[in-house]
């Protein structure tokens, strides 16, 4: 699967889900009650477009070299480009914010994946939801360690 397909698939799926949801109940509820939903699931609609914008920015900065605040983009020198990019505070802040949102997005997606695989059971679901949060947190911590290390000058 290509990167474009990877980005397009969740967009297509969310549009399809919204269409099915609206067709099933064209009249909205008078009172919105979020008893069964968690914060991650309630933020999917707005975190998705922000994560997409982040992916586009990330590709333009680190792959295409179109955006290179702070210094010159050097084709093929990934180490230089990453360090130079993350030395700009707002790039690091944007990256940390977006990856944190990605973590919320992933925790919901991983939890939904377990349910889609039929692993939903009153005994196992709470453990699987905690596993989804732990997996997403590990991914977030791994990815944000890079800009934090550059900002703290651990990586130069």
Task: Please provide the spans of the model-predicted regions.
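Juxtamembrane boundary at the C-terminal end of a transmembrane helix
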Residues: 142-156
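Divalent metal-coordination and catalytic microenvironments
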Residues: 10, 58, 105
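Interfacial and helix-entry/exit segments of alpha-helical transmembrane bundles
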Residues: 32-53, 127-140
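Transmembrane alpha-helix/helix-exit interface in multi-pass inner-membrane proteins
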Residues: 18, 43-72
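Membrane-interface interhelical connector segments
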Residues: 64-88
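Short, small-residue-biased leader/transition segments that mark boundaries at the very start
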Residues: 2-3, 7-9
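Alpha-helical transmembrane segments of helical membrane proteins, especially in multi-pass transport
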Residues: 61, 87-109
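Membrane-interfacial helix termini and the short, flexible loops that connect transmembrane helices
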Residues: 15-39, 66-73, 110-130, 154-155
